[in-house]
Design a protein with these regions (language model features):
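Membrane-embedded transmembrane helical bundles of large multi-pass transporters/channels
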Residues: 1-37, 41, 91, 112, ...
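Structured non-transmembrane domains adjacent to transmembrane bundles in polytopic membrane proteins
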Residues: 45-161, 376-544, 550-569
Length: 694
């Protein structure tokens, strides 16, 4: 390790040049990495809803089908607009009644199902826009943007592709502000806690390298979710800032003992490497636990963040020393006193009253622990988006004018007779909440020769060996009523055709609900188990990992219980990921406190004195880390219009503060009270035989 440290210091200029040059391919990779805005695409591919969605995309080209509600528009103007939309690249077809019948034919002559489907309230009709790509492809995004420009007044464009296009536009516009808020918040905390006005900027420069490298290497993942992209920089900034602080503090200590800055840095690298490597393992393990999710969004976020932490460690050890040595004289020139308190009075209070502190905390935990399970969770992804987005407005308009809050796409084998399909459609119409049912047979009627229908229509309703039935419902996706509706549809379809499939937003969100409940349990189990094992190996203890993880889990329970008391609801993904993020990111505080407590006990101090000293000396580091993590995420929560991101960041920022308070108040008291148990269940906890017992 000493040889490696010496090589890093000796070749610091070469390392800095190489690091800067590596930013170029990393930046190219970051720009070239596709971003996925469709959370439902992360569902397991073997689910019926996903299999059906793939068939809609490959055989029917309906996966990215969107609908335009047109109110009060003359037929000739509507046909002219339809023709313009047909000319847009990637638009396969814009379907309206004129594709089947002469527009002069009175609507009263149409079958009742067709009338109900094509004409709604407010003198409205509907255009079905069929796009060639998937709902998240770049071609689809461009086509949606062009169609928006063509639409006249009183036209409302709705559908998943439109909403995803709006989401992309919103997130890409806000993302630079996320980073600026995170950087600004971190700088403010660092100005207060560090001893030089230049050091915060130096840290930000040092963190630029792992951030860009992390985003650049995402290209090897194929694509990343917009949630990951939005959170990764902010989380990486908040989580890995500690490593830079540890290195600088150790370097300042070594400078007082060594003959040269180079020697001081070599010693600092050696001592920092072991401490931050062990510390980062718990954080990496916490993020990798997200890979246990069936919803592969977890693996997406977990891998990117674990990779970011690992790169943060490497860059702290290899690149940051070069920057510190290069700017050392300016750092010294602009020194100032730190404004972060040591919490001396608090340390004496906690060490004098450990039992009351723990009792009060346990009593406080009871209501929050009960409230945690009662916090309202919602699964309607679009409810987490601004409701004034054009795609949301257009989709809601379908519900207002046509009763289409949710579309169900039902696929059955083409071998089913017209009579069987008709019977199935009649049964579907009786399902609670279903407003319209349209199939080939409801359009043509019995005995009609399908060869007379245009290819454009036939390709929509029958293709790839399957017939398509479209059922519209008035319930919103993710609701209990909608989930019950999907169950009933699946039952009816399977009775008519054991190979039949029900897909669409409603079916996929129902699968999401079921998977999310399982993912929540799996992620918590894996993250807790991984962190327990790492801490147990680090301390060679059975009791210490339980105490440390219990402290953070208690903080998580309080964090998750607060929404119940403030009458707030959480998006499902926030409830899944917050536990592992808060555990992985803040368990380091407890490790730092426990390590210092052990050092004080080894120095022959009593448990009371050791707890007091540990709290006093660790308070500044924990305050700096906790407030930095809070500042990095709170800014995003304050400005984001995407409720999904706002909720996650608010939980993380609040969790950082709660974990910080628990570690500063409760953990030292717990270490004091359980000192005897820790000594008996930890291998060589106290090597010094004369360590005080009282």
């Amino acid at each position: 390790m000493k040889k490696l440290a010496r090589a890093i210091v000796k070749m610091r200029r070469l390392i800095l040049i190489a690091a800067v040059l590596l930013l170029i391919p990393a930046a190219v990779g970051a720009i070239a990495t596709p971003i996925n805005y469709d959370i439902l695409s992360y569902l397991p591919q073997e689910l019926d809803s996903r299999v059906g969605q793939l068939l809609l995309e490959t055989d029917f080209h309906l996966a990215s089908t969107n609908m335009i509600t047109v109110e009060g528009m003359p037929t000739n103007e509507l046909l002219a607009m339809k023709a313009e939309i047909d000319e847009v690249p990637d638009v396969l077809n814009t379907f309206w009644l004129s594709d089947v019948l002469d527009p002069a034919v009175p609507t009263e002559m149409l079958p009742a199902d067709v009338q109900q489907f094509m004409f709604g309230k407010n003198d409205s009709t509907i255009l079905i826009v069929q796009l060639g790509g998937s709902s998240v492809s770049e071609e689809t995004m461009q086509a949606v943007a062009q169609i928006k420009k063509i639409l006249r007044k009183n036209c409302f464009f709705g559908g998943i592709s439109v909403i995803l296009s709006d989401t992309k536009e919103l997130v890409m516009g806000e993302m630079p502000w996320y980073v600026l808020c995170a950087v600004g918040g971190c700088l403010l905390v660092l100005f207060l806690s560090l001893e030089s006005w230049l050091t915060p900027f130096l840290f930000m420069l040092g963190l630029l390298f792992p951030l860009v490298y992390n985003f650049g290497t995402n290209i090897f993942l194929g694509q990343v979710c917009f949630i990951t992209v939005s959170l990764a920089a902010v989380l990486q900034l908040g989580v890995t800032m500690d490593f830079s602080i540890f290195l600088l503090h150790r370097y300042d200590e070594e400078k007082k003992l060594c003959a040269s800055n180079e020697e001081a840095m070599e010693n600092a690298i050696c001592k920092t490497m072991s401490s931050i490597t062990a510390s980062s393992l718990t954080t990496i393990a916490g993020f990798l636990a997200l890979c246990a999710m069936q919803l592969t969004l977890g693996a997406d976020l977990g891998i990117v963040m674990a990779k970011g932490v690992a790169l943060g460690v490497i860059c702290t050890i290899v690149i940051l020393p070069s920057l510190i040595l290069f700017f050392d004289q300016w750092v010294e020139k602009y020194r100032h006193r730190t404004f972060m308190p040591k919490l001396t009075h608090l340390s004496h209070f906690v060490s004098k009253h450990p039992m009351p502190v723990v009792v009060v905390f346990v009593l406080l935990m009871i209501p929050f622990g009960l409230a945690q399970s009662k916090t309202d969770i919602y699964y309607n992804i679009f409810a987490a988006l601004p409701q004034d987005m054009p795609g949301i407005v257009g989709t809601n308009k379908l519900g207002e004018d046509f009763g289409m809050m949710t579309n169900h796409f039902i696929l059955v084998r083409e071998e089913l007779t017209a009579s069987q399909v008709s019977t199935l459609c009649d049964e579907i119409k009786e399902v609670d909440g279903i407003t319209q049912v349209v199939s080939l047979d409801s359009i043509t009627g019995p005995g009609f020769e399908t060869e007379l229908l245009p290819d454009e229509l036939m390709n929509i309703v029958q293709n790839g060996g399957c017939k398509l039935i479209l059922a519209n419902g008035r319930y919103k996706s993710g609701s209990d009523a909608l989930n019950a509706q999907v169950d009933e549809l699946v039952r009816l379809v399977k009775e008519a055709d054991p190979e039949g499939l029900v897909t669409g937003e409603g079916a996929m969100v129902k699968d999401l609900v079921e998977i999310a409940d399982e993912d929540f349990k799996n992620v918590n189990i894996w993250s807790i188990a991984a962190v327990l094992v790492i801490i147990a190996l680090s301390f060679r203890s059975l009791s210490v990992p339980v105490l440390l993880v219990a402290s953070i889990e208690a903080a998580i329970a309080i964090n998750m219980g607060i929404p119940y008391f403030i009458d707030d609801s959480l998006p499902f993904i926030a409830s899944i990921v917050i536990g592992t993020i808060q555990l992985g990111a803040t368990v380091d505080y407890s490790i730092l406190m426990t390590t210092r407590y052990r050092e004080e006990r080894l120095a022959l101090r009593s448990p009371k004195a050791a707890a007091q000293q540990a709290l006093e000396h660790c308070s500044q580091s924990i305050l700096t880390s906790g407030l930095t993590f809070f500042a990095a995420t709170f800014g995003v929560a304050a400005i984001s219009k995407v409720e999904l991101l706002e909720s996650i960041c608010m939980l993380i920022s609040r969790g950082a503060l709660i974990s910080m308070v628990v570690i500063l108040l409760v953990l030292p008291a717990g270490l004091m009270l359980l000192d005897g148990l820790i000594c008996r269940t930890t291998y060589h906890w106290l090597n010094a035989p004369n360590a005080a017992k009282e």
